[in-house]
Structure formats: C-alpha cells, structure tokens
Amino acid sequence: MAKEIERKFLVKSDGWRSEVSSSSDFLQAYVASGDDRSVRVRIMDGKRAKLTIKIGRELLARDEFEYEIPLGDAEEMANAAVGVVLQKTRHEVRHEGYTWEVDVYDGAYKGLVVAEVEVEDEGALPDIPDWIGEEITGDRRYSNMVMATEDLSGELCHGVPSAAR
C-alpha cells in the first residue's frame, strides 16, 4: 500500500507548456464511489490500463492501491462507469526537483486545467512555479471522483483563463 500525498492547484497561464517532458491521454471512469473510497479505471493512450482503489476522507493524503489490468477489462468497466467519464491529457513538468502533473481536461470539463504535485509529507510545499494559481487541495469539487459522479462541469469550467486552456 502506498500513501498518496498531493497538492492540487488551478493553472493560471500556459507558461508550463515549454517545459513539458512527457504527455499522455487519459480516459478515467469511476466504477464505484463512496464518501471515503473510490474504485476507478484509467486507460492511458488507448494502450494500457490501471485499476486504482483509493481509501480515506482527506483529499491531501489517502491510501492508494494501483494495479495494471488488461485493456479489454478496462474498456468494459469504463462502459459501466458511474457518472461522467473524464477525458484529459496529462503533461509532466519538472520544476525545482518536483514533477508537476498538469491535467488539461477535454469532454465535459473542456477548458479546466489543474496541476498536482506529489509531496513527501503533508506539510511540504515545493517552490511554486509562476504559472500556478489558487491552491484547491481539499476543495472536493476538484476531486476527479466528485467531478465524475456529480458533473460540476458548468461550475468548474466557468471563468477559467483562456491562456490556461
């Protein structure tokens, strides 16, 4: 079991684009969700798939179990998704010793751009790049599970700066 500790931010500009080291297209579907746990399937670049179980109420730190699964199984699970299937492109950006994951959403959340950084403990805060905006760690509306199961696309995509999209 791994403990996932990550901070999440809105992205306010496209200054990160010139620093991208890799990118992957994700299709992310929730098979089950509850107040303190979720089961999701993720298909990466249409070629690989993972099943992830997250347990814990805190959005900053949760237990995470992740397993590679056959692509066909993942596609079948995605077809049985609860709510909206999320579509996004994840870009990795290195900054001051940390890897930032910048998610550019498509589909229902087109226009939303968020960045996450995994940290070693709950008090850690890495050097913040200038393209990072408001911290949204702990704001449940930006949890992928909530976005998928409650469809907040109208609320979350409103007012996103066009430069960040």
State each model region's role.
Residues 1-165:
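Phosphate-end processing signature that detects enzymes handling 5′-triphosphorylated RNA
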